[in-house]
Each structure stands twice: as C-alpha cells, then as structure tokens.
Amino acid sequence: MPVRIIDHVYAQYLLTRLRDKNTGSLDFRKGLVRLGRIIGYELVKTFPFRYVEVETPLGRAVGVDIIGLDKVVIVQILRAAMPLVEGLVKAFPNARLGVVAARRKEEEGYVDVEVFYSKMPSIGVEDTVIVADPMLATGTTMSKAIEEVYKTGTPGRLVVVSVIATPVGISRVLSRWPDTEIYTVAIDPELNDKAFIVPGLGDAGDRAFAT
C-alpha cells in the first residue's frame, strides 16, 4: 500500500491536541516533534535487518542490526516541517538533511507555489529520502520539493511524511511518482477556497511559531 495511516492511539491523541484551536504554540510544536518521532519509528520497522551476535560484559547475545539507517536523507519544507523533522531525526540520528523553502502565490483564486531556496545533500540509489511537511493539502508544495530531490539524484526509496493529508494531495503526488510511499496520521476530506485542509488544524507554521 502506498499510503499508510498511523493509527497508533498516542499518535491519534497528539493529532487531537494539534487540531484543538486552544492548543498553544509551545504544546503545538511539542506535539509535532512527538509525532515526527512516532512516524519515524514506524518507518524504521520497514527497514531490512539481520541477526547479529554481540558480546555483552557477561556473555554473548543475539540481536538485530538494521540495514540502511546510515543511508537516510530527510528533506524539510520550511518552516512548518521543522518540529516534525526534529522528531524524525530522533529515529534517524545519522540522517543527512536537506531543505526546501517555498512560498504560496495566490492570484485570482489560483494557488501556486514558488521555490525560492533549496539545498540538498548528495542523493543516490542506496538512499531512502523522507520529505516532510505537516500538511499535504493540494500536493503542490510537496511536488515542488520532490522535484528538487530528483534534480539532485534518484533515491532508491522516496517517502512522504505528513500529519494530515487529503485525497487531492495524495493523488497529485502518486500520479507523478507512483512508487512514493506516504505516511500520515489522518486523511481529511476537503480543501477550502484558500487551499487549507478542512477540518485540518489551521496553518501549521503559524500555530507552531505563534505568527
């Protein structure tokens, strides 16, 4: 399945707190960080592993070695993704980090996105690239970020991480990159005339940084 909904009860609890309009910016940021960590751990479960034997101070034990943790790139879409990526890095502490900065352009009811800054580490076929943005609304911003990834290199695996997605955003991404995996905590049904997710949680960047 290209779309995975994180139905862990604590993830759903955190999402409920984020949706609540009375949640302050500090708790909102903390919630995004915690969700990033949870989603990251769910992603780790999908990595291949092998059994290894290690020597403890008192004997020998069989454990696991996860393969590919040193071949992860996390791309954050500024600025709303910053707390989410902070959590993802807890699960992938050796990840290389990329950044995409984009702005919305609204003209006569039409919403477009302009990338005005992009900086990527090297990307190769052995890498898993995780592109993070709390809100996968129209999919336009995410598509621009993925384009920046492929301008740099072709990853072996591409994963989109969001907190809330919409069918429109999911369809836009998968129609262009059908092998992409999408991890999200919820899928909301609607977009309003400003291209915000309804019911959603509002503007994630503004709420996280009290602007």
Swiss-Prot record:
Signal peptide: none annotated. Its cofactor is Mg(2+). It holds the Pfam family UPRTase. Uracil binds at residues 197, 202-204. InterPro entries: PRibTrfase_dom, PRTase-like, Upp_A, Ura_phspho_trans. Its EC number is 2.4.2.9. Allosterically activated by GTP. 5-phospho-alpha-D-ribose 1-diphosphate binds at residues 79, 104, 133-141, 203. Pathway: Pyrimidine metabolism; UMP biosynthesis via salvage pathway; UMP from uracil: step 1/1. Binds 1 Mg(2+) ion per subunit. The magnesium is bound as Mg-PRPP. Coiled coil: none annotated. GO terms for molecular function: GTP binding; magnesium ion binding; uracil phosphoribosyltransferase activity. Keywords: Allosteric enzyme, Glycosyltransferase, GTP-binding, Magnesium, Nucleotide-binding, Transferase. GTP binds at residues 30-34. GO terms for biological process: UMP salvage; uracil salvage. It catalyses: UMP + diphosphate = 5-phospho-alpha-D-ribose 1-diphosphate + uracil. Belongs to the UPRTase family. NCBIfam families: PRK00129.1, upp. Catalyzes the conversion of uracil and 5-phospho-alpha-D-ribose 1-diphosphate (PRPP) to UMP and diphosphate. This is Uracil phosphoribosyltransferase. It comes from Pyrobaculum arsenaticum (strain DSM 13514 / JCM 11321 / PZ6).
